[in-house]
């Protein structure tokens, strides 16, 4: 598993520890560098004609949404999942997208978050939201929590 997938997987584990397997939980993640950390490693493996060794184990992680697949497999999720690329955490988008999924019945719960990983520098900010939440789910709350 690549660094981005490990980061997302471990952060999601904390949120899903009390959730039943196969729950109707959607995943909406974003970051800035996509899968660039793994892309660079893969490019190095194919750049040298004398030492050409493309690794299928590395190649599979050259898409950022693979981390969502790892989480889905672990928790038997068969729900909506999307991975977006933004210059910075976008609380307006996250709140709107998650609320849309909840209000249209596409999911009972949504794990949203920012999982950035590049050159051993990382940040994970994930949260679980449902219609029965105790904290208002809006961009103001998200912005405040993200910047803590």
Predicted regions, residues:
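Active-site-proximal alpha-helical scaffold in enzymes
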Residues: 8-13, 85-108
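Short glycine-aspartate micro-motif
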Residues: 26, 107-112, 136
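Condensing-enzyme catalytic core mediating Claisen C-C bond formation in acyl metabolism
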Residues: 73, 79-82, 125-148
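Flexible, glycine/proline-enriched loop segments at strand-loop-helix junctions
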Residues: 54-59, 81-89
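Short acidic, glycine/serine/threonine-rich loops at helix termini
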Residues: 39-41, 122-127
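Acyl-CoA/ACP chain-elongation machinery
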Residues: 76, 117-122
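Short beta-strand segments
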Residues: 28-31, 85, 112-116
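Conserved beta-ketoacyl condensing-enzyme motif
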Residues: 1-70, 74
